[in-house]
Amino acid sequence: TEIFPAMLRAVRLAQSRIDFVTYVYWTGDIARQMAYALAERARGGVEVRVLLDAVGAQPMSQELIDVMTSSGVELRWFRPPARWKVWEIDHRTHRKILVVDHQYAFTGGVGVAQEWEGDARNENEWRDTHFQIEGPAVDPLRATFLSDWRDAGGRASTDLEIPERPLRAGNTLLGVVDASAQIQLNTAGRAFEAIIALARERLWIGTPYFNPAERLTGLLVEAAQRGVEVRVMIPGPHIDKRVSLLSAEEQAGRLLDAGVWLHRFQPSMYHVKQVIADHTLVMFGSANFNARSVYKDEEVAVVAIDPHLNEVLAGDYLADLDRCDTIRDRNQLDRSWAAVAAGKALKPLESEM
């Protein structure tokens, strides 16, 4: 409930430039508010660039598109399906980045849709986390936007302008991970690898789509076996992709046998994307802990070193645990033969989930 007011406030106060890329732009009051806020700043002389994924943002209304473009917003679509570029259809931009005046950046898991207008108070409100960033880390986030913008044919007139700023804006050390499609693990996947390998006490993962690459699954097993408290929180009954849930269950037995805790969030769709390692390190952004994010999609992640941020996110994680069903043993999965068969049938499709 705090996310959109902060984003809208930043947009409405913009003086020079707004850069915005998102995979999800659907419907609802926030979709209308955001479109009209962007349009108003464009009419006020602010350079506004909006990049929408051509697959993920399909449900967006033409009315809101017209509101923005008629006001001077430069709106582009990322990789529209084309018969002569069929290989691009499966490689989307899953990023969610808003940069305002080189001063503020927002990133995380939140899209622009009514599903994110609450905070899991009922099954229609998704549970998610988004972050506002200031300081030097704004620049690489904007550079990540620009990589997608240029892919979509956007111009690059003054894109290289970087304002002078202090090397540090606070007590948090941030590193931005710009991940693109690769045959092997991309940089988001390698960041997951590094954090898992570094963990010594706890590794708490939140992800809406849990279908890790085989190497990441093996690293989670190794972490649990060396005494790390490994927890994975995923959606429970309210998931927007049942296929993904079945595939996650296919791997759950191996993880549970190694001592990993599996938590299913019950109130609504769980869409948080984060890793909390020990008491200092966290990772958040658009990347899911699944094969698509580490092989196929354009993603952005932020790795932060900050004991206070770690503690805050750990507190949120523990609060969410109170609303989860917890599984410690493969026998608790209580799966029917049909579900087992479905999970195995989905094995060849793991890279699609």
PLM segments and residue spans:
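Charged, low-complexity intrinsically disordered terminal segments
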Residues: 1-353
